[in-house]
Amino acid sequence: MDFKLKDLGKIKKADIKLDGITVICGDNNTGKSTIGKSLFSFYNALYDYKTKISMQKDSRFKNFILSNINSMDVPVRLLDNDSTMSFITSQAEDFSVEDVKKYLEENYPIKVTKNKVASLVEYLNLPEKDILNEYVFRYFNLVMNGQIKNLNSTGKSSVTAEIKGKSDTILLNKKSCSCELDEPIEHSAYYINNPFVLDWLNLTNVSWFLSALNPMDRNVISAIIKAQADINEDSMSNILETVINKKELDEIRKVLKRAYAGDTVISHGKYYYSENGVDFDFRNISAGLKSFALIERMLETGVLKKKDILIL
């Protein structure tokens, strides 16, 4: 894959070939982190974007239902996630006031006027491309801390990935962006920006604190927590991912074992690094070992898959 940046952060222009393990070298403060952040943002903003758009619409839909149930003093009941999402995905951008009103009144104890439903339908029928552009811009803006553009340039910023002879491009302005997509992004990216995020696995009520993390750190820890929770709830979950990982990522696992010689032990909800019969709380292992512990957890829980992007 060829990854190209123009007028982004500290970078005027960059053309990088990503093939297997790619090492980017350079002096301090010349834009190496900008490349990593751009790659992370590009993949995660565009990966499975149709589902993300449907989730945005689903959230608006649920808020509408709850506000009308509350306003009519009807006891609130749990929303049927599968039902609302199925309805939204089946309609795409072709919602009608009549169909939405019918669905609401048949599935929930509410009565709504056509005028109220019309305002909801306006949101639901927003073009996919407009929603995607807004989502991608916000994601880049968040990761880049509000400084996407090269401050020494007045031109448009752009990020392009050329994959399988096709290209996906994001054109970025100060307050908006435009996505031109030829090839779907089918893999996630993970950025181990700070090895000390490993400590969050052993914090009480960690989910509550995740919002305080930057997107890169939150992305890694959230994925590990979710995958492990799925395994804890159902020991038969993630079997396919685990089998594929063991088969196709075996070489990586062998290399990892040279640095991460021990094993991970989970006891009473806490993670430990176990070596020579001694268990060390993840929070007490060295910074270097923490990075390898994160990779080990991502592999063993099926988070990190073949062709996913791992940025260190």
Tell me the role of every PLM-derived stretch:
Residues 43-307:
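Phosphate-coordinating catalytic segments in nucleotide- and nucleic-acid-processing enzymes
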